[in-house]
């Protein structure tokens, strides 16, 4: 199966379960992490033909997605004597995808890269759309570029080795897509047998459908708003809260998708308090998240600090926080005129 991301410039295809043989007449630099390399690198190498292949592994986890690790990656690229015709392959989850794309975008002012995601979260979100970057002390993904891959290959085979926690985290991003753009997808999600899904024993077709539905939705959004001027902001549903939670917990307590799950619950509570979402729809999202074992609560210790952290969000402008809300489910809304009092009141409900 193939889905084309039809951009005015730099259009590309996402191949789902179609990874066969990749041929290059240049050097190839594979960026991965130790776990994925141990599980799947031999499989990937058997499918690549190139002049030379270089392999670099970096520690995985949001806490390592920073400028220090980026410098390490770039040094390995220079030591490999890559040129502008070389190709970087990001082979891993969302962290590897973000860092690999960023490295490719700034190495010698840009080289080609290909995403081969190995987590569900990366398949449905991080690997498609061209957002790249790293975190710093001020927040998540505040340093980065928009830089599109030449191709993306999503293989359900790789997902079979994921933990139930990793699969659930990917499902959170899929739920986000449904809540913003297609209410009917929630019906599909509710029919999935959570036990076989979380054990990765479900039919490959389930993974294929999840990936395809997500990419079809996201590609349509990216095609209309590649640089996130407005419409693409809706893909950040739950993320305004999630990024603060991740930053406050040093990126160690929650997987990204888990933080997004909590963020969606918080965003829904805000929408509920503002009269933009009804209780039944808010509860429906909670029930679906719980079905897949995702967290739905976070204890805020200092409401004022949490509130101030919102202003480091990339969607904030002119001292206003742009919140992405579901109003109703299946239809996203960007609202930047919410009073501090209303925001604080919602945050206090999570103390």
Swiss-Prot record:
UniProt entry keywords in alphabetical sequence: Amino-acid biosynthesis, Aromatic amino acid biosynthesis, Cobalt, Cytoplasm, Lyase, Metal-binding, NAD, Nucleotide-binding, Zinc
Entry's cofactor comment: Binds 1 divalent metal cation per subunit. Can use either Co(2+) or Zn(2+).
NCBIfam families named among the record's database cross-references: aroB
Chemical reaction(s) catalysed: 7-phospho-2-dehydro-3-deoxy-D-arabino-heptonate = 3-dehydroquinate + phosphate
Signal peptide: none
A Pfam family matched in the record: DHQ_synthase
CC cofactor: NAD(+); Co(2+); Zn(2+)
Positions of transmembrane segments: none
Assigned EC number: 4.2.3.4
Biological role: Catalyzes the conversion of 3-deoxy-D-arabino-heptulosonate 7-phosphate (DAHP) to dehydroquinate (DHQ).
Pathway: Metabolic intermediate biosynthesis; chorismate biosynthesis; chorismate from D-erythrose 4-phosphate and phosphoenolpyruvate: step 2/7
Enzyme class: lyase
Gene Ontology molecular function: 3-dehydroquinate synthase activity; metal ion binding; nucleotide binding
Record-listed NAD(+) binding positions: 60-65, 94-98, 118-119, 131, 140, 158-161
Domain of life: Bacteria
Binding site for Zn(2+): 173, 239, 256
Family: Belongs to the sugar phosphate cyclases superfamily. Dehydroquinate synthase family.
Main location: cytoplasm
Cell compartment(s), UniProt: Cytoplasm
Species the sequence originates in: Campylobacter jejuni subsp. jejuni serotype O:2 (strain ATCC 700819 / NCTC 11168)
Cysteine disulfide partners in this protein: none
Name of this chain's protein: 3-dehydroquinate synthase
Biological process annotations from GO: amino acid biosynthetic process; aromatic amino acid family biosynthetic process; chorismate biosynthetic process
One Gene Ontology cellular component annotation held by this UniProt entry: cytoplasm
